[in-house]
Amino acid sequence: MQRIAVVPGSFDPVTLGHLDVIRRAARLYDQLVVLVVHNPGKTPMLPLEDRVDLIERVIRDAGLPATVRVDSWGAGLLVDYCRQVGATVLVKGVRSQLDVAYETPMALVNRDLADVETVMLLPDPAHAHVSSSLVRQVEALGGDVAPYVPAAVAEALAVRRAG
């Protein structure tokens, strides 16, 4: 039986921390779906389609195996998507105790609803301080985001800023 895991997130934009979690999760599971989810509580900087395209490019540039794919999910519970693709694990990157506290109740509900386990991966210390919201803030103020995001993302944001 293939072990399928899902790495969900808004990835707005995808960061080096995200890539680190994706890379490590790809070694742990037979198939990995990087799932770009629509969060109705957030107004995204990048449209969903652009985020999917960027993650596909980042995964290709990183040389990750074909067992890693990208998808999107805009409606319904995350566990509904997991059922649809046969995934039994959600992989979440957690940078701090605050992230663990935020993720724990959702992990328990996901296990109750669909017997989907949540695995929390700690970040590479070099990226522990990086978040998409930090990148958005730096970018909005005209700062250099290259230290925090894959090259494809830095290029796309520079093009977007140039107009």
Curated annotation (Swiss-Prot):
Function in brief: Reversibly transfers an adenylyl group from ATP to 4'-phosphopantetheine, yielding dephospho-CoA (dPCoA) and pyrophosphate.
Name of the protein in question: Phosphopantetheine adenylyltransferase
Primary location group: cytoplasm
GO MF annotation: an example: ATP binding
Enzyme Commission numbers on file: 2.7.7.3
One Pfam entry name: CTP_transf_like
Subunit structure: Homohexamer.
Binding site for ATP: 10-11, 18, 93-95, 103, 127-133
Compartments reported by the entry: Cytoplasm
CDD domains: PPAT
Designated gene of the protein: coaD
Keyword Transmembrane helix: no
UniProt keyword terms in alphabetical order: ATP-binding, Coenzyme A biosynthesis, Cytoplasm, Magnesium, Nucleotide-binding, Nucleotidyltransferase, Transferase
Site (Transition state stabilizer): 18
Classification via InterPro entries: Cyt_trans-like, PPAT, Rossmann-like_a/b/a_fold
Reactions catalysed: (R)-4'-phosphopantetheine + ATP + H(+) = 3'-dephospho-CoA + diphosphate
Pathway it works in: Cofactor biosynthesis; coenzyme A biosynthesis; CoA from (R)-pantothenate: step 4/5
Cofactor(s) annotated in UniProt: Mg(2+)
Residues that hold substrate according to the record: 10, 42, 78, 92
Domain of life: Bacteria
